[in-house]
C-alpha cells in the first residue's frame, strides 16, 4: 500500500518524506541508490556513505521523472517499466532487454 502509479507507468512508494528542494531538469543531484531486477537481484548500488553526483539530464528517463517529484532528504522505492529504463537494448550484461527495474533512491542534495 502507499504505492502511487503515474500515467507513464512509473510506480513509487515514499519510504521517507523529504523537506528540502525539488530538483529541476538542469540541476545536479547527489543520491544514494540500490538498483534491483524484479526478482530482487542487485545489479548496481552507489558507494557506501558517499552516494553519486550527476546532472539530471544525463540519466534514464525514469530517474529524471522520479527525482523531479522528490524533495531533498526523501527516500523512495521506484519501479521503472522498460520504456522508462533501458528499453529493448538493456544495459551491459546485468540488465537484459525489456526489463522492469526497481530502485531505492535517497535524494541527498540538489545543486543548481
List the model feature ranges, each with a label.
Residues 1-112:
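Cross-family detector of peptidyl-prolyl cis-trans isomerase
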Amino acid at each position: 500500500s502507499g504505492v502511487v502509479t503515474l500515467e507513464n507507468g512509473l510506480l513509487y512508494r515514499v519510504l521517507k518524506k523529504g523537506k528540502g528542494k525539488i530538483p529541476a531538469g538542469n540541476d545536479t543531484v547527489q543520491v544514494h541508490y540500490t538498483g534491483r531486477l524484479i526478482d530482487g537481484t542487485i545489479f548496481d548500488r552507489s558507494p557506501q556513505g558517499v552516494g553519486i553526483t550527476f546532472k539530471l539530464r544525463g540519466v534514464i528517463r525514469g530517474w529524471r521523472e522520479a527525482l523531479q517529484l522528490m524533495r531533498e532528504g526523501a527516500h523512495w522505492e521506484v519501479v521503472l517499466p522498460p520504456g522508462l529504463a533501458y528499453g529493448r537494448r538493456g544495459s551491459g550484461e546485468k540488465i537484459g532487454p525489456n526489463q522492469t527495474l526497481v530502485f531505492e533512491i535517497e535524494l541527498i542534495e540538489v545543486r543548481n
